[in-house]
């Protein structure tokens, strides 16, 4: 950062009228001081040189401090924008990476779907059979609404079936078909134009071969992810507080895959990949480009993309401010460099006042009356310089404080959004897996053999291997007896807190039941959520014959969500003073990145904070455990259908905390 500012100092300064104005004022005062000192030297021969020499030394200290101030003003004005921009880029990249990881698991699971395999194994299919599978895929996309098409390809490129009936093509020449067949039983990720979606300039498609029971290739399954819709949602949320900027997803070859401003950065235009902060001129305008690449999630890193944020250089200082008092500046500890400059300028001004006072005493003793106006003028200049220092620092501190509060609020909202997005997937998984034909056929039988239990356990283990966010996945029957699990356990009765009983009362495949966040035997007596969906009889669609339970691996998953969104230092560690947690409406902690607050304990914030946060994310000062914090609270609002229209209610909050040193009342 410092090297970047030093390299582009004059360009940056030209876009910051406030900084330039302070520099001009200080230079004018310095010039006037020089002229007044010269007059003093000419007209004060009787005083000797000691006082004037002391004044010159003090003037030199002011000059050095002036350069330090201007450099810090440039640094901080630039830093407040770039740190926020960098954070937004990383947030967008992290959210997208998490989302795409789920897609890699989806394609692996769906490629083994019994109904899809049976359909593709037939040489010829009737309209009735096509309609049945089409409904099956419609149910899938009703759960996983992030897809805008599902396509089944024969090995020769024939389109056997597709969800989006608006496309009339019957054959595809897309190279992803052969690439997928070459890859074997792993997924292929394709991001470019595809004749499978001819109306799009760029598609993101996950594909994987489909095999029969003898491991003969039947064709290729393609899931078309609606990346434009997803990125529009992500970017729009991050640009609410930064509407003059634009964001783009850039591929490894420097092409724009998606942009928040299609006019200035159209899809497939060249933006170039950048490795670090960059000053770039585009269409007669200077931009600061911040960038973030994937940090990976569950060993998945994505296709080598990066997110860029372009902020016009002339908007760096267009930030509203909040009042910041001397106490806030000095005591919070949030602005150490600025506080040090302000303190030093005060000390230098005090020294100058003493020198002037000594000069007045010496002038009186030696009857050098002509020197008094010079001393008064220099005293006034010193006071004016200090006022410039003081006002410029206070203005900047107010700007930085505003940015700090905005950052905390944004991070809290992001944490809440990431949680909703993650748990949205969990609600989808349980409902879709409950429609698995082999699960339903097995539980529809009056008795299940040991061999069948073992086969079910193997299927569950395969799924669990794809979806590693679960501790275990299990099936239970209508008597609440454990039938099979991904860990090999069987037998026994489902515990009361698992939501299994509530699941057996469900009446629709689109419904699901979730346990409270309480300790569970299925999770080593640690608190977690268990997601359940009912299995319906294959022939009697209204009869519930059991359920599937998904034990969310909440401890590492929630912790990773919080850790990912917290600001990082240059070494990649969480910045000092920052912590975060998820809580329920009563303040009970679900997860925390702070040893002080463990799951099940209570974050002792006033209840009014949570009530006010329901209306809008907020930031407050508060004392916790004898320490002072800035606390941002954001409510979870749901994602797509999850907690918005699916009937599930569980109000949670994300809390971001920044510890500081002020000791005044809350």
Predicted regions and their residues:
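Extracellular/periplasmic juxtamembrane segments that couple receptor/chemosensory ectodomains to their
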Residues: 2-76, 263-403, 602-666
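Extracytoplasmic/periplasmic sensory segments of membrane signal-transduction proteins
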Residues: 27-185, 365-509, 562-573
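Short beta-turn/strand-loop junction motif enriched in small, turn-promoting residues
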Residues: 94-95, 139, 192-195, 210-211, ...
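Solvent-exposed, extracytoplasmic
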Residues: 131-144, 220-267, 273, 313-333, ...
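Extracytoplasmic/periplasmic ligand-binding sensor regions of membrane-associated signaling proteins
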Residues: 134, 139-224, 230, 276-285, ...
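Short, surface-exposed beta-strand-loop junctions and turns on beta-sheet-rich folds
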Residues: 167-168, 195, 263-265, 295, ...
